[in-house]
Amino acid sequence: MGRFIFVSFGLLVVFLSLSGTGADVDCLPGWSAYDQSCYRVFKLLKTWDDAEKFCTERPKGGHLVSIESAGERDFVAQLVSENKQTDNVWLGLKIQSKGQQCSTEWTDGSSVSYENFSEYQSKKCFVLEKNTGFRTWLNLNCGSEYAFVCKSPP
């Protein structure tokens, strides 16, 4: 009976330590897991369009990062900070002109359900703003060159 309790307790500890870490997601080497997706910071300086193209050409595909919750925002901010990024970082959000209407959507096609805009300017592409610890979004000129974060399926 004592052995059963000991083994059960050990399994419980392992389960609890792995839950919520993305441990069940199998990412390529150099990529980090969070909530069923893989993420990687690239320090290459690219325009927004070139960065998005680069992300889609990765072995498992993907897009510039979309951020759909405060938890994901914090994970990405930590990942960017750990990579000692010294400037703003592109994310996969762009203002799209459709006829006379504009819409904002993620490059992976998902709608914007979580927002964290720093301020709104008349530019079309968004970065994670360095001055806020990469936690808020600022729209800048799409032709500027910044590092970026790709998000891909596992």
Swiss-Prot record:
Under the heading PROSITE patterns, the entry gives: C_TYPE_LECTIN_1 (PS00615), C_TYPE_LECTIN_2 (PS50041)
Every C-type lectin domain range = 34-151
Where does the chain cross the membrane? none
Q: Which Pfam families match?
A: Lectin_C
Subcellular localization: Secreted
Indicate which residues are glycosylated according to the record.
Answer: 116
Subunit and interaction comment: Heterotetramer of the subunits alpha-1, alpha-2, beta-1 and beta-2; disulfide-linked.
Any idea what this protein is called?
Snaclec agglucetin subunit alpha-1
Q: Give the source species.
A: Deinagkistrodon acutus (Hundred-pace snake)
The lineage is: Eukaryota, Metazoa, Chordata, Craniata, Vertebrata
